[in-house]
Design a protein with these regions (language model features):
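DUTPase catalytic domain/fold
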Residues: 1-183
Length: 183
């Protein structure tokens, strides 16, 4: 079942920047481009302008996601992924990038695709304070509690001594930003 696309108002801050586009049918994110050329040394971060401002309808938000190719090929990540663009924000969308490669600089040229913009319907909720929350299967299990990786308890979701860092349990928690020297 197909429906008409949501109309989002957009204004170019840079008159030459291409508007965000979906590269292929079915893509969730429209590509955002930088309007600045910039080189990032290993470990350096920068705020890159996209040259566009948007006006989202009430009940919607846009989320700035990383481009997987930049992460896989260059070690580029977004510091606050996903970045949230609220419906009431009218300023230029900017993208906070970081070069996680320990050895190589990465260069962005004007109009390079740097991120993806995903527009989604969002709910405003009313928070109701209670003394106790209802029980669930997960309960208070947090980071790594479901396993699935050797560093957090085994490749098959191991529990018990392996999950506690035993003979096959790895170090239990994987580092979010690891030292990539020697890779």
């Amino acid at each position: 079942m197909s429906r008409d696309p949501l109309n989002v108002l957009i204004r170019r801050v840079d008159p030459d920047v291409p508007l965000p586009t979906y590269e292929r049918p079915g893509d969730a994110g429209a590509d955002l481009r930088t309007t600045e050329s910039r080189e990032l040394a290993p470990g350096e971060r920068a705020v890159l302008p996209t040259g566009v401002c948007i006006a989202l309808p009430e009940g919607y938000a846009a989320f700035v996601h990383p481009r997987s190719g930049l992460a896989a090929r260059c070690g580029v990540a977004l510091v606050n992924a996903p970045g949230t663009v609220d419906a009431g924000y009218r300023g230029e969308i900017k993208v906070i990038v970081v070069n996680l490669d320990p050895r190589e600089s990465v260069r962005f040229e004007r109009f390079d695709r740097i991120a993806q913009l995903v527009v989604q319907q969002v709910e405003r909720v009313r928070f109701q304070e209670v003394a106790e929350l209802p029980d669930s299967a997960r309960a208070a299990g947090g980071f790594g509690s479901t396993g699935g990786h050797a560093a957090v308890g085994g490749a098959s979701g191991t529990s018990g001594s392996a999950a506690e860092g035993g003979a096959t349990g790895g170090n239990r928690y994987a580092s979010v930003v690891s030292d990539r020297e020697g890779q």
